Amino acid sequence: MHPQQLVVSWFSLVLLTSPIVAIWELEKNVYVVELDWYPDAPGETVVLRCDTPEEDGITWTSDQSSEVLGSGKTLTVQVKEFGDAGQYTCHKGGEVLSRSLLLLHKKEDGIWSTDILKDQKEPKAKSFLKCEAKDYSGHFTCWWLTAISTDLKFSVKSSRGSSDPRGVTCGAASLSTEKVIVDHREYKKYTVECQEGSACPAAEESLPIEVVVEAVHKLKYENYTSSFFIRDIIKPDPPKNLQLRPLKNSRQVEVSWEYPDTWSTPHSYFSLTFCVQVQGKNKREKKLFMDQTSAKVTCHKDASIRVQARDRYYNSFWSEWASVSCS
C-alpha cells in the first residue's frame, strides 16, 4: 500500500470519520481516496472544510454536478465511485473561497488497480517499469508504456533506502517520439532520467534503488514501483569507432573498436567483454567472444561485421550492436 498521510493545511482541511486513514495529499489541495472496489462497498466518508473565517452564506458545488451540494463551512461526502470524486468548491456571494480535488485509488480483491500502464511482462509479469543504466555513475533512465493519450499526468520519485529518501533525484517524465507497437496496438512511451547524488561507482551496493511512478488519468490515481541495484540494470552503449583493416595475403580482415564514451573509467577496472559476428544477407556466422578490442574475421562481400559489449565481470545486458560494412 502507498504510504498514507493525512495532511492538514490552512487552505483546505480534509477530515475522515473512518478510523483507518484512507486519504492522503498528493499535492496541494489534491487528495487521494483509497477505496475497496466491490459491489455495495460502503466507501469512505470525507468531510471537506472551507478555508474562510466566515461562518454563514457558504455554499458547495462540484464539477460532477450542477446542483448546490450543501451549505455551511463543511461538506460531508460519501465517496463510493468516480462520480463522487472530482473538484469540490466552496463559494460565498459568487466568490470562490477554496477548492479540493478528490482522486480515487481502487483496490479489488486486495490488489491495487494497474489500468493506466501497460504490463510489459519482461523479465516477469507485472513489469510496468523498465530501467537501464549505461554505466556505474548512478545515472539511469526508466520508461513505461500506456495506451492513454489524454488527461494523463505522471510524477516520479526515487530513493535508495529509507535513510536518504532524497538521495536520488528524477526529472519530469517526458513523452518519447518513439512509437511502440505491441500485439498490433500502438502505445505511448514515457521516459524519465534519474541520478543518485552520492553514487560511488566502485562501491558494492547493499540497498536497492526504488523508483515510484505516480499516474493520474482523469480522476483515477495509481502508483507503480520498481526496485533494483544499478549493477542489475547495466546496459552499455555500443562500441564506437569500428574500423576494418585488410590483412595481406589473407581473406580475413582485422576489425577494431573502442569502448563507448559513456562507459565508466578506468577501463582497467570497469572492463567490458565483446561479441563479434559477421552478418551476411542470408546467414549469420557464429559469434566470437573476446576481451580485447580487435578481432580477425573473414569478411564476405555484401556482409557486415557487428560488435556488442557487456560488463566483463558482471552478467549485465548486452549493448545494442554497432556495425561496419565489409564492402
UniProtKB/Swiss-Prot annotation:
InterPro entries: FN3_dom (IPR003961), FN3_sf (IPR036116), Hematopoietin_rcpt_L_F3_CS (IPR003530), Ig-like_dom (IPR007110), Ig-like_dom_sf (IPR036179), Ig-like_fold (IPR013783), Ig_sub2 (IPR003598), IL-12 (IPR050676). Glycans are attached at residue 223. Disulfide bonds join 50-90. It is found in: Secreted. Residues 238-327 form the Fibronectin type-III domain. Keywords: Cytokine, Disulfide bond, Glycoprotein, Immunoglobulin domain, Secreted, Signal. The keyword Repeat does not apply. Residues 23-106 form the Ig-like C2-type domain. CDD domains: FN3 (cd00063). Its main location: secreted. It holds the Pfam family IL12p40_C. Residues 1-22 form the signal peptide. GO terms for biological process: natural killer cell activation; positive regulation of activated T cell proliferation; T-helper cell differentiation. GO terms for cellular component: extracellular space; membrane. GO terms for molecular function: cytokine activity; cytokine receptor activity. PANTHER family: INTERLEUKIN-12 SUBUNIT BETA, INTERLEUKIN-12 SUBUNIT BETA-RELATED. Cytokine that can act as a growth factor for activated T and NK cells, enhance the lytic activity of NK/lymphokine-activated killer cells, and stimulate the production of IFN-gamma by resting PBMC. Associates with IL23A to form the IL-23 interleukin, a heterodimeric cytokine which functions in innate and adaptive immunity. IL-23 may constitute with IL-17 an acute response to infection in peripheral tissues. IL-23 binds to a heterodimeric receptor complex composed of IL12RB1 and IL23R, activates the Jak-Stat signaling cascade, stimulates memory rather than naive T-cells and promotes production of pro-inflammatory cytokines. IL-23 induces autoimmune inflammation and thus may be responsible for autoimmune inflammatory diseases and may be important for tumorigenesis. Heterodimer with IL12A; disulfide-linked. The heterodimer is known as interleukin IL-12. Heterodimer with IL23A; disulfide-linked. The heterodimer is known as interleukin IL-23. Also secreted as a monomer. Interacts with NBR1; this interaction promotes IL-12 secretion. Belongs to the IL-12B family. This is Interleukin-12 subunit beta. The lineage of its organism: Eukaryota, Metazoa, Chordata, Craniata, Vertebrata. The gene is IL12B.
